[in-house]
């Protein structure tokens, strides 16, 4: 589970996002009122969920938004609430002591052409994708559109980009860009250390990185999480 993995990584000196695990709403609500109410946070299931029920609030959430995100994430083994790290999520695929690929991830989105409605753009993009990476026009996506004063029927201006999710994950329709040859090698070493710490010969490691070209500095706060 994520919380146990974070404890092991932190003990090994690997940077992890600050946060806590909650299983009961009264405890989470109290923590929200005292700690999280005015901060950018991430709410996600404690068990890995392939990007499902993960909500990122770059703008601090209202109590109503936090309530909904907590209960959507709290379906199995509790909820992790973390401080939101600055930067972009990079997905490292590791086998043995080798990084096979590094993919930059972007949240599910569509780009307008001045003619098609958002729902048509989603269908068009899904037509070129594997079933496992389809964009979803679900309740969460509709909330994201509503927050941007948009509906599935809205026709976007040419070049206008609209995001359907807050979290970047390929399983929820996110975009992927291969940066294996571009990213500084220090982050590959960090990912390998994380996999070794968790004793995983085959691993997928996600790291939020502020600048993929700047070498990793353990003393620099917030450079990688």
State what each model feature region is.
Residues 56, 94, 207-209:
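Conserved hydrophobic "DFG−1" position in protein kinase catalytic cores
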Residues 1-30, 34, 49:
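Conserved N-proximal alpha/beta basic substrate-recognition cap immediately N-terminal to
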Residues 32-43:
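Acidic/histidine-enriched active-site and ligand-binding environments that engage anionic O-linkages
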Residues 60-169:
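Phosphate-binding site of ATP-dependent enzymes
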Residues 32-33, 93, 215-220:
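Short glycine-biased active-site loop of nucleotidyltransferases that positions the nucleotide triphosphate
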Residues 41-68, 89:
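Glycine-rich phosphate-binding loop of ATP-grasp-fold ATP-dependent ligases
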Residues 98, 106-113, 166-225:
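ATP-dependent carboxylate activation and anion-phosphoryl transfer catalytic cores
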């Amino acid at each position: 589970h994520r919380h146990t993995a974070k404890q092991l990584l932190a003990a090994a000196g690997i940077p992890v996002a600050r946060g806590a695990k909650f299983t009961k709403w009264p405890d989470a609500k109290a923590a929200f009122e005292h700690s999280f109410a005015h901060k950018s946070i991430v709410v996600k299931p404690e068990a890995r969920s392939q990007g499902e029920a993960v909500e990122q609030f770059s703008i601090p959430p209202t109590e109503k938004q936090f309530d909904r995100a907590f209960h959507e994430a709290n379906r199995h083994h509790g909820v992790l609430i973390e401080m939101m790290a600055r930067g972009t999520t990079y997905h490292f695929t590791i086998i043995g002591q080798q990084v096979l690929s590094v993919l930059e991830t972007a949240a599910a989105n569509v780009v307008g052409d001045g003619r098609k409605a958002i729902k048509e753009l989603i269908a068009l993009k899904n037509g070129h994708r594997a079933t496992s990476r389809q964009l979803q026009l679900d309740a969460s996506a509709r909330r994201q559109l509503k927050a941007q004063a948009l509906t599935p029927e809205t026709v976007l201006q040419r070049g206008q980009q609209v995001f359907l999710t807050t979290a970047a994950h390929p399983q929820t329709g996110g975009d992927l860009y291969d940066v294996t040859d571009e990213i500084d090698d220090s982050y590959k070493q960090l990912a390998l250390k994380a996999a070794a710490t968790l004793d995983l010969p085959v691993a997928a490691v996600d790291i939020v990185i502020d600048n993929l070209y700047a070498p990793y500095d353990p003393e620099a706060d917030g450079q990688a999480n």
